[in-house]
Amino acid sequence: PIFDPEFSESSFGYRPHRSAHDAVRQVQTIIRGGRRWCVDMDLSKFFDRVQHDIVMRCVSREVHDRRLLRLIGRYLRAGVMVEGVLQPTEEGSPQGGPLSPLLSNILLDELDKELERRGLPFVRYADDFMIFVRSERSAQRVFASVQRFVTQRLKLVVNEQKSSVRAAPGCEYLGFAFVGKRATIQVAPKKLKAFK
């Protein structure tokens, strides 16, 4: 309850009453609004690469109880079992852990606020996000500047093989494709093929 009211309206993952379908409909609305190019970014091994100091800095902006902050720090550093041996964790957030979804949203809210400050329409579901612009040239510039922000400010890695600039009609997000000028929502061909 402390953080969620402050999160962006464009953030959908791991939040109450904000489903993947809501995110997909938001993408459709943005494309229909005239944003014809998208920057589709994938963060490489997001949960494994979360920097503890950056997450703790973000959390401490709203949480001032030192005991709670220490507990969250311990959660992040709890370690993982590798072949029966406990290995300490210097970075990353335990995948499947109860706090990890919230901590990921707290960290990526930094990105959301930056995109809002720049006036860029976007949709983010957990660590999967798309940014929308009007031209290919703008999309290329936004890709480069957001990649810099993610790398320098959040100390995360953009997976360049899975990230791209492309025309928004025809793009795919969360397993759905947006077809034609009306951005009609269809199951993405890859997902349909996998289902068969």
Residue ranges and their predicted role:
Residues 6-172:
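Conserved polymerase palm-domain catalytic core
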Residues 179:
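Polyanion-binding surface elements
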Residues 182-196:
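Basic, alpha-helical interaction scaffolds
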